[in-house]
């Protein structure tokens, strides 16, 4: 497993969230990771390969914190204060692309086609899980993923289950480019913090393991219902209505079915408690978009004319705390959002 994460910079003066490229010195890159430039948004981080979700969470934090340039002697860029993992802000989108393979040599096309069938009708759930762009062009909107709603026709083209092509901008595609081994690529998720990316990897790894074992596809829906769920997930996030075998379900009930169906695969992963907390929070109506929304809503009340600057300042501190090893709860608290206790929330 691996990810490509696109993101914004937080620049001075004014803690402005911008497209400015953040470029760490290449000598601090570890083998297998790249600091690169995306044509659309600018800054992109290409991770090394992960084999476990615990490894993914640790290495994502370790890799992404290298973009705190002010901490390095030879990677400083003037006026860059921090970075922001958001799916959208002004007028550009930032996304996360997941790459899945079955070994060092990648994944053959036939196996990728089979795995894509297992994943396809869960795509709306993954959109809801990772929705993280409620702000667009300086306005707090009612939508969870403006990036997906406004950019999917160009950057995440809809596919039908059973159709897997090499077209780069399909929402799920067979990625066989350059010298890298071929992978199955999923492009639907907003740019996000490591906890949400690793949570998505939990579900993708569980589905992949079930596919390898020869288990049946867990969810098959009519294409028209898939399209409805896809749109619902981008608009409403955790409040969306999804479909499981063409039956309407809320996101919490859908999540429970996922944990029931893939219980053996998930139990065998040694999923960290902080990732289980992500799922528990999702079950009670909180994802990345909701955390950002609550923070922005509070700041609009207290600083109606300068709420974006205050959000940028809070986010700069919050993301440093998170990537330095603290939890999602600390991140949310630094943004002024108190997350509810989830000790009694059960999954599955």
Please place each PLM-identified region on the residue numbering.
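C-terminal accessory/tail domains of diverse enzymes
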Residues: 1-80, 86-89, 117, 128-348
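Long, hydrophobic, well-ordered secondary-structure blocks that form the structural core
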Residues: 78-126, 130
């Amino acid at each position: 497993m691996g990810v490509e994460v696109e993101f914004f910079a937080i620049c001075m003066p004014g803690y402005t969230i911008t497209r400015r490229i953040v470029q760490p010195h290449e000598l601090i890159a570890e083998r297998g990771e790249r600091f690169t430039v995306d044509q659309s948004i600018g800054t992109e981080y290409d991770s090394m390969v992960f084999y476990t979700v615990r490894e993914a969470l640790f290495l994502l934090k370790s890799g992404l914190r290298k973009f705190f340039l002010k901490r390095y002697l030879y990677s400083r860029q003037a006026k860059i204060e921090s970075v922001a993992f958001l799916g959208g802000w002004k007028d550009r989108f930032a996304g996360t692309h997941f790459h899945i393979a079955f070994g060092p040599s990648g994944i053959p096309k036939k196996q990728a086609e089979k795995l894509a069938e297992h994943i396809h009708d869960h795509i709306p759930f993954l959109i809801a899980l990772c929705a993280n762009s409620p702000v667009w062009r300086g306005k707090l909107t009612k939508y969870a993923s403006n990036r997906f709603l406004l950019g999917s026709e160009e950057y995440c083209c809809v596919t039908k289950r059973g159709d897997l092509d090499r077209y780069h901008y399909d929402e799920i595609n067979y990625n066989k480019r350059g010298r890298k081994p071929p992978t199955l690529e999923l492009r639907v998720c907003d740019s996000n913090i490591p906890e949400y990316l690793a949570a998505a990897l939990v579900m993708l790894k569980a589905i992949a393991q079930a596919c390898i074992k020869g288990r049946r596809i867990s969810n098959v829906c009519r294409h028209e219902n898939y399209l409805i769920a896809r749109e619902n997930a981008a608009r409403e996030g955790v409040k969306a209505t999804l479909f499981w075998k063409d039956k309407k379900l809320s996101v919490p009930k859908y999540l429970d079915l996922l944990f029931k169906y893939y219980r053996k695969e998930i139990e065998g992963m040694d999923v960290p408690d902080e990732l289980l907390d992500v799922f528990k929070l999702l079950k009670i109506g909180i994802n990345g978009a909701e955390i950002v929304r609550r923070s922005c809503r509070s700041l609009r009340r207290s600083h109606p004319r300068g709420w974006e600057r205050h959000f940028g300042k809070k986010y700069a501190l919050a993301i440093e705390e998170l990537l330095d090893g603290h939890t999602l709860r600390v991140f949310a608290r630094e943004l002024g959002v108190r997350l509810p206790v989830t000790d009694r929330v059960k999954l599955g």
